Amino acid sequence: MPSLLLVVFILQFLLHIINTVGASTVNDLLWILYNKLPTPTSSSAQKAQKLKKEIVQLKRELGATSAQDNFSKWAKLDRQHNKAMAEFQKIDGSLRGHQTAFTSAVSTLRWLGTQGLRFVLQFWFAKSPMFWMPAGWLPFYVEWILSFPRAPLGSVSINVWGIACASMIALAAEGLAAVWVLATKRPTPIATEKKEAMAFAADQKSSGEKKEL
C-alpha cells in the first residue's frame, strides 16, 4: 500500500495540473481519447472528421469555380456541399449530445477522484500523524498549528501536509516556468540596442532644440 504522504502529494499534484490546464481542456482531451478507442461514438466521430475535411475541400472548389462561366460544375459542387453539410450537422448534433453526457460523467468522476478523495482522506485520517517533529524543536503554538485540527500535538496533520504539498508544487511550477522563459527568451542584439539608444538621443536633442526656438 502506498504511503499516505505520497498519496496526498500525488493528489495535490493532480489538482494543480487540472487547475493549471483547465477542467474543460481535460474534458476535451478525454473526449478525443474516448473516440480513439473502440467506443459506440468512435465511428461517428471519424465520419464527422471525414465530412469536415470534405466540406472544406468543397468550399475551396466552389470558391475557385465561377458560377457564370461553369454553372453546371458549380451547381454540382454546391449540391455536394449542401448534402455533406446536412449530414455533418446531423452527426455533429448526435455527438454533442453524447459529449454532454460524457463530460458530465467525467466531471463527476474527476471530482470524486480528486476533491472528494481529499475530503475523505482529511476526515478519515484527521487524528493520524503524517510524521512527528523532533521534541522541543518548535514552540507550543507552532506545534499546535502543525497538528491542526485533530492530530496529536507534536506531529504534522494531513491538512497541513496537504497545504505544504500544494505550496511546494506551486512554487516548483513557477520556478520551472521562469527557467523556461529565461531559457527560450532571445537576447536583444547589441546593434539594435545601440540604434534604439541613438534614436532616443536624437529625439531628445530635436525636442530640446524645439523648446529653445
UniProtKB/Swiss-Prot annotation:
Keywords: Coiled coil, Endoplasmic reticulum, Membrane, Transmembrane, Transmembrane helix, Transport. Its main location: endoplasmic reticulum. One of its GO terms (biological process) is tail-anchored membrane protein insertion into ER membrane. It is found in: Endoplasmic reticulum membrane. Residues 1-4, 132-155 are lumenal. Pfam families: CHD5. It is a multi-pass membrane protein. Residues 41-68 form a coiled coil. GO terms for cellular component: endoplasmic reticulum membrane; GET complex. Residues 25-110, 173-213 are cytoplasmic. GO terms for molecular function: protein-membrane adaptor activity. The chain crosses the membrane at residues 5-24, 111-131, 156-172. Interacts with GET3. Required for the post-translational delivery of tail-anchored (TA) proteins to the endoplasmic reticulum. Acts as a membrane receptor for soluble GET3, which recognizes and selectively binds the transmembrane domain of TA proteins in the cytosol. Belongs to the WRB/GET1 family. This is Protein GET1. It comes from Phaeosphaeria nodorum (strain SN15 / ATCC MYA-4574 / FGSC 10173) (Glume blotch fungus).
